[in-house]
Amino acid sequence: MKHIFLKTIILSLSLVAVACQGEKRRGDLSTLDKPFVESYNNERADAPNTSDEDPNTNQRKTVKVKQGLEIPIGKANVPSLLLYREGYTTSYNADTRTPNWVAWHLTAAHTNGPAKRKGITFQVDEDIPEPRVDTYDYMRSGYDRGHMCPAADNHWSQRAMEQSFLMTNVCPQNPALNSGLWNSIENQCRTWAEEYGDVYIVCGPIYLNQKHKTIGKNKVQVPEAFFKVILRLKDEPKAIGFICRNVSAKGHKKTDYVNTVDEVERITGMDFFSQLPDNIERQIEGKADIKDWN
């Protein structure tokens, strides 16, 4: 377990270095105003239930989960255009030319289905204002077009599969990370969805520095890292987070990148799974152990 918080330590050291230079890091909560809410308010008729034990009665009390549980509270003063897709919701940032976050509810049924990936190419998202990122921005850049919501999570619907290839669902990602550790985490999420029936997922880029490398004519900003947080409700509510540097993770395991959701919130300035009752949210976001998921 000694490597579990490896990436958190590295990110924390980055924060110290930036602070010493007198710069403000985008993920430093001390530089942010009170975040604005980007969430749904309508309850879903078939919303799943979770439960928590009442300490006064030792009885299990049922908690109704609202629609949009996966939608986070975003950072203040950050460009955000909400785009609602068949299989996910994304907050697009016109400054970075990447999503702030992408969120989706992954069910066991979503991991299998008739939708095929073959023949689908990455597409410009016509729903955003110009300049629009296109696939040519990534050509010979040294970075993959890294899906945030993976195509493999959208086999349940051909439309959802096609929309997963919109450029607003993509970030510049190190090729070895994309095909290696990040892909392994994506596969793990699908396994969890099959095991527990469904999971709620949020992921996106982390911009640590004041200035960032850019690629392409549209100057897509390259993130320094990526985050992913996952929530399950079946049996007993559990949450887990991952933070991965945007470099090759060859030689490392998923467990080396596990973080609590609280730590991911501290680094990103976001609030995840805020529709949960406060006591449950505090309980599950303050600890993370991948053994609890196996």
Question: Predicted regions: what is each one?
Answer:
Residues 12-19:
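Hydrophobic h-region of N-terminal signal peptides that target proteins for export
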Residues 5-7, 19-294:
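Domain-level detector for secreted/extracellular nuclease and nuclease-toxin modules, and
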